[in-house]
Amino acid sequence: AFPQRVKVVEVGPRDGLQNEKSVVPTPVKIRLIDMLSETGLPVIEATSFVSPRWVPQMADHAEVMQGINKLPGVSYPVLTPNLKGFQAAVAAGAKEVSIFGAASELFTKKNINCSIEESLERFSEVMNAARAASIPVRGYVSCVLGCPYEGNISAAKVAEVSKKMYSMGCYEISLGDRIGIGTPGSMKEMLAAVMKEVPVGALAVHCHDTYGQALANILVALQMGVSVVDASVAGLGGCPYAQGASGNVATEDLVYMLNGLGIHTGVDLQKLMDTGTFICNALNRRTNSKVSQAACRL
């Protein structure tokens, strides 16, 4: 039995643009988010309050947050890796934040230069500040179906990290297959383990299409009761670990599949495709959305 409705979390402006080589002008980012707001998407991850030294693409985070037209009923979460980022985000008007963890020790070490345990301790500072400010926090767990450095990751480890982030107060845990290596079988096994520790209503999946498995993996998650799915307009965001490989699943393709299954999303597919066309033209690249590629030929 599929869920009757699915909340689509648009991650293109943050996770998508973050991997773009050339810096995207601030007005283009603002226009992208404003167009996405008009599609009916309920959640649009807007930017990341990380140090510009680490991610130059997101250096304009405050300008973006203050420049976008925030529609009622739409949330605009931002990624905040630490307390400093959290404070800057709140100062810029953020009403929801995300923290980014991983189920791989080596990935955590290379990504934020500490152990998983230490990363969770760092998050507790953000969690406490967020609680005091009544700001909801979403937790990402990366490398849930494999790691670019460690290879296989056990479902038990994913469940353990997810449980810790959930019990710290994250209202939703987004399980991310950053390298897109998972298949429906490994997705099913991993979700079964995590669902023993975290209620399915608090889970989301974040699938990359690097190996062409994203929609199949999402379908399995839906069958298991997951009703929140992350996606990126036009499939923006390559894979940082595999040059030229596709990254995030395209929001257009996800919505097309959900429409076909009769699952309600509230998203206008045509407006979404127009937004994909806009950002691809602005970036001078072709879309990674199969639906948009097909529509171009009609």
From Swiss-Prot:
Keywords, ordered alphabetically: Acetylation, Disulfide bond, Lipid metabolism, Lyase, Metal-binding, Mitochondrion, Peroxisome
Gene Ontology cellular-component annotations: mitochondrial matrix; mitochondrion; peroxisome
Native source organism of the sequence: Gallus gallus
Protein name according to UniProt: Hydroxymethylglutaryl-CoA lyase, mitochondrial
Signal sequence interval, chain numbering: none
Span(s) of short sequence motif Microbody targeting signal: 296-298
GO biological process: ketone body biosynthetic process; L-leucine catabolic process
Protein family according to the UniProt entry: Belongs to the HMG-CoA lyase family.
SUBUNIT field: Homodimer; disulfide-linked. Can also form homotetramers.
